[in-house]
Amino acid sequence: MSLPLTRKDLMIVNMGPQHPSMHGVLRLIVTLDGEDVIDCEPILGYLHRGMEKIAENRTIIQYLPYVTRWDYLATMFTEAITVNAPEFLENIQIPQRASYIRVIMLELSRIASHLLWLGPFMADLGAQTPFFYIFRERELIYDLFEAATGMRMMHNYFRIGGVAADLPYGWIEKCLDFCDYFLRGVVEYQQLITQNPIFLERVEGVGFISGEEAVNWGLSGPMLRASGIQWDLRKVDPYESYNQFDWKVQWQKEGDSLARYLVRVGEMRESIKIIQQAVEKIPGGPYENLEVRRFKKEKNSEWNDFEYKFLGKKPSPNFELSRQELYVRVEAPKGELGIYLVGDDSLFPWRWKIRPPGFINLQILPQLVKKMKLADIMTILGSIDIIMGEVDR
């Protein structure tokens, strides 16, 4: 019996949700004609945990440990947006020292996030060496986090009105040592990767996004800046004390996967510049606004009275969120992370809407992979940089 040499029908392949290069529980239904991608349908929701609904049944302080499970590789940013929202809503001022500490922690977290993007991205392309190199530097950042917050990940460090604790003795010197060491590490990455001809073959011209497309799709972060749009919230809508530091927005005009790589590597250099300036200029003073703890404080009940409360530990400060609404945003490593908060004169938010950058950046994936080769899916998906905890929430 003779078999046909070629088949004309299309093949449908499931990639994920347990595929190692999916960067989480993402499932792609890919329609192939040989090696050519005809269609791609992302299936989301495998990691949905109802984070927005949980927020409506918790006070802000009770909700803080939950938010580190969105983007679990850049947890400082989820904490920052969670405390910034009620601070803006109630017009709570934070001390200058606390603002500088926040900036230092945010930029260290940005570097750690970009490092853990770079390693798996290179592994997806077949280069294993950088995957091990990035953990060397990332471990030093986590040592700094552990010394300041007590936790390597899921720090729970930011508080309404400041931070949970001041920087320990000797921490600033260790941070400066890391900055000097890391700049040499970035040079090593560029020597190893940027001019590698095999790497350039895999990324140049792959996953092209024009500036107009990036704006129309609502992309943000390195995805937007790699398409020629100089938009960084730290410059255009400053928060914390970013307007007091000298640094440049990293951008490229090519719009391909190589441009997104160059933007992120450049951002790591700029983050080091911001950290060095913040550490050298950090002011003295308190690390939290103690007045927040007295905000709408209940009167002390008399001993053995009907309303007397036996407290095993000092309670967290709670206050009512006034009846108004606002949108707050920060420049996270993956793009614009925003919160739309609605208060209704109660301890709990009436609405807590999360604007995750990864979810919106992922929407352009089917357009990028069409008419590309099957192997290019890994390159394009890796260059987007997604974390499914943030995408599915």
From Swiss-Prot:
<dbReference type="GO" id="GO:0019684">
    <property type="term" value="P:photosynthesis, light reaction"/>
</dbReference>
<keyword id="KW-0521">NADP</keyword>
<dbReference type="Pfam" id="PF00346">
    <property type="entry name" value="Complex1_49kDa"/>
</dbReference>
<dbReference type="GO" id="GO:0009535">
    <property type="term" value="C:chloroplast thylakoid membrane"/>
</dbReference>
<keyword id="KW-0793">Thylakoid</keyword>
<dbReference type="InterPro" id="IPR022885">
    <property type="entry name" value="NDH1_su_D/H"/>
</dbReference>
<keyword id="KW-0813">Transport</keyword>
<keyword id="KW-0520">NAD</keyword>
<dbReference type="InterPro" id="IPR001135">
    <property type="entry name" value="NADH_Q_OxRdtase_suD"/>
</dbReference>
<keyword id="KW-0934">Plastid</keyword>
<dbReference type="InterPro" id="IPR014029">
    <property type="entry name" value="NADH_UbQ_OxRdtase_49kDa_CS"/>
</dbReference>
<dbReference type="GO" id="GO:0048038">
    <property type="term" value="F:quinone binding"/>
</dbReference>
<dbReference type="GO" id="GO:0016655">
    <property type="term" value="F:oxidoreductase activity, acting on NAD(P)H, quinone or similar compound as acceptor"/>
</dbReference>
<comment type="function">
    <text>NDH shuttles electrons from NAD(P)H:plastoquinone, via FMN and iron-sulfur (Fe-S) centers, to quinones in the photosynthetic chain and possibly in a chloroplast respiratory chain. The immediate electron acceptor for the enzyme in this species is believed to be plastoquinone. Couples the redox reaction to proton translocation, and thus conserves the redox energy in a proton gradient.</text>
</comment>
<keyword id="KW-1278">Translocase</keyword>
<keyword id="KW-0618">Plastoquinone</keyword>
<keyword id="KW-0874">Quinone</keyword>
<comment type="subunit">
    <text>NDH is composed of at least 16 different subunits, 5 of which are encoded in the nucleus.</text>
</comment>
<dbReference type="GO" id="GO:0051287">
    <property type="term" value="F:NAD binding"/>
</dbReference>
<protein>
    <recommendedName>
        <fullName>NAD(P)H-quinone oxidoreductase subunit H, chloroplastic</fullName>
        <ecNumber>7.1.1.-</ecNumber>
    </recommendedName>
</protein>
<keyword id="KW-0150">Chloroplast</keyword>
<keyword id="KW-0472">Membrane</keyword>
<comment type="similarity">
    <text>Belongs to the complex I 49 kDa subunit family.</text>
</comment>
<dbReference type="InterPro" id="IPR029014">
    <property type="entry name" value="NiFe-Hase_large"/>
</dbReference>
